[in-house]
Amino acid sequence: MITVDQIKRVLPHRYPMLLVDRVTELVPGERASGLKAVTCNEPWYEAVPDDAPAEAYHYPWTVLLESWCHVAGVLVAWEEPNPDVLEGMAMLLGGVTDAEYHRPVLPGDVVEHHVRLARQVGETYMFEGESLVGDATVLSVGRLVMTMRPAAELKDPAGEVT
C-alpha cells in the first residue's frame, strides 16, 4: 500500500488538488488502483447553502476524473518520481475519450479507481479503467492519453513555465 506521504513524493499536487488518498495496488507498467474518500469539507462544497438538496453535494465529475488521473500519474511516475514540475519531466494530460459518468458520488463515499496501462509509445501513455463506489461503477474511461515532457521545453523564451 502506498500512503499519501509517498504519493506526494511522486505527484506535484497538493491541497486542495491532491485527489488520491492511498494507492492500494501498483504493478509498474501494467496497472494501479487507488482510493479517494469524499468529504463535505472539500472546497467545491464551500458555497453550498445549508438548506441545499442532496444534488448540490454531487462530487464534480471533472474532479472525479482528475482523481482517477492522479492514480494514472502514480503508475507512470512511480519508478522515476519528480514532484517538481519546474525541473525534470513534467506530466501532461493529452486528452480523454469515451469517459462516462454513471452515477453521482456524494460525501461519505469512498471511490476506488482502477487504471490500466493499455499502451505506451515512448513517453506517451494510454490508459483505460473505471472508478467504483462499492460495487457500482461511477466512472468509466475508455481512453486517456498522458505524456511526459522535459519541463525546460515548456518554458517560454522569458524562462517562465507556460
Give the location of each predicted region.
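Catalytic strand-loop segment that frames the active site of acyl-thioester-processing enzymes
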Residues: Y15-Y59
